[in-house]
Design a protein with these regions (language model features):
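Short aromatic-glycine-(Arg/Gly/Cys) micro-motifs in beta-strand/loop hairpins
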Residues: 25-51, 77-82
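Long, compositionally biased
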Residues: 19-21, 40-43, 90-92
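Low-complexity, intrinsically disordered regions enriched in charged/polar residues
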Residues: 2-5, 41, 66
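Short N-terminal "domain-start" leader segments
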Residues: 2-35
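Acidic, aromatic-enriched beta-alpha/helix-loop junctions
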Residues: 44-70
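Mixed-charge, Lys/Arg-enriched low-complexity segments
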Residues: 65-92
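N-terminal start-of-chain detector that recognizes signal peptides
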Residues: 4-9, 46-51, 71, 91
């Protein structure tokens, strides 16, 4: 699957358009990143801030609050610590 970095406005548009199969909150190195996955297009959109840095959250609750604020009610949580991956579907 191809990964594209997109800004906040485009990420929000993906949420509103319904063109996303899954939203993923993934933990890397102690912080949380967001992805919007479009399987039909074979693209995973990675949220990036305007200045080019990756947008991150320090807690899962903060990332969940952001997603809720843009209208996302269900997302998948993945933890990548110590080479173990866990998947947890959360609905809010």
């Amino acid at each position: 699957m191809k990964i594209e970095q997109i800004g906040m406005a485009a990420f929000r548009q993906q949420a509103e358009s319904g063109g996303v199969d899954e939203f993923v909150v993934q933990r890397f190195g102690g912080v949380y990143h967001l992805f919007a996955v479009n399987r039909r297009a074979g693209v995973s959109y990675f949220l990036q801030e305007r200045r080019g840095d990756y947008k991150t959250w320090l807690s899962l609750d903060c990332a969940a609050a952001f997603l809720s604020g843009i209208g996302v009610s269900r997302f998948t949580v993945r933890f990548e610590d110590n080479k173990h991956a866990e998947k947890d579907d959360r609905g809010h």
